């Protein structure tokens, strides 16, 4: 009986945790072209220094696909190789934003992204060396336009 209660409690906790990390309230199908604007770097050489597109070379994102379907589907394609091949831990999509986050198996690397529908701004953050005292961050900012005029 104790084992049954323990397993039931664990499943309830996992379900609650999953519900907190997934909140899809809007179906959408976005096809975005995003122009790189600036990056903020935190690493041994730079302490949260900002660089514009004129100061550092970064690629634009062509054909960023965001598909969401209630209650729990959120797919993002072409943002990064990491996002293309991993399951998302955080999936939020509503009338204002979409937010995603994922970690590698060792939980020492993560990527997250926030897209604001109203402004078209996309922020893509990469964090490395999470388990170490000196984490490194690469935070890129993009200006996006939706190619699907009807969404």
Where do the protein language model's features map onto the residues?
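Contiguous, well-ordered beta-strand patches that form the walls/edges
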Residues: 69-115
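Edge beta-strand at a domain terminus
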Residues: 126-151
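Short, hydrophobic/aromatic-rich segments at coil-to-beta transitions
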Residues: 24-33, 73-74, 93-101, 120-123
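Short, surface-exposed coil-to-beta transition loops
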Residues: 60, 85-86, 106-112, 123, ...
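Extended soluble regions of mature proteins
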Residues: 113-128
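Classical Sec-dependent N-terminal signal peptides that target proteins to the secretory pathway
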Residues: 1-22
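Short, solvent-exposed loop/hinge segments that bridge or flank secondary-structure elements
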Residues: 29-74, 109-115
């Amino acid at each position: 009986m104790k084992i049954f209660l323990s397993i039931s409690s664990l499943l309830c906790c996992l379900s609650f945790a999953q519900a907190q990390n997934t909140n899809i309230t809007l179906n959408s199908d976005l096809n975005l072209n995003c122009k790189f604007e600036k990056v903020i770097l935190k690493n041994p050489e730079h302490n949260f220094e900002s660089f514009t597109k004129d100061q550092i070379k970064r690629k634009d994102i062509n054909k960023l696909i965001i598909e969401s379907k209630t209650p729990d589907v959120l797919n993002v394609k072409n943002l990064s190789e990491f996002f293309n091949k991993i399951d998302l831990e955080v999936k939020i999509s509503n009338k204002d934003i979409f937010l995603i986050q994922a970690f590698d198996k060792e939980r020492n690397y993560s990527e997250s992204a926030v897209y604001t529908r109203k402004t078209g701004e996309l922020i893509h953050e990469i964090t490395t060396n999470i388990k170490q005292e000196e984490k490194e961050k690469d935070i890129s900012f993009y200006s996006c336009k939706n190619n699907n005029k009807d969404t």
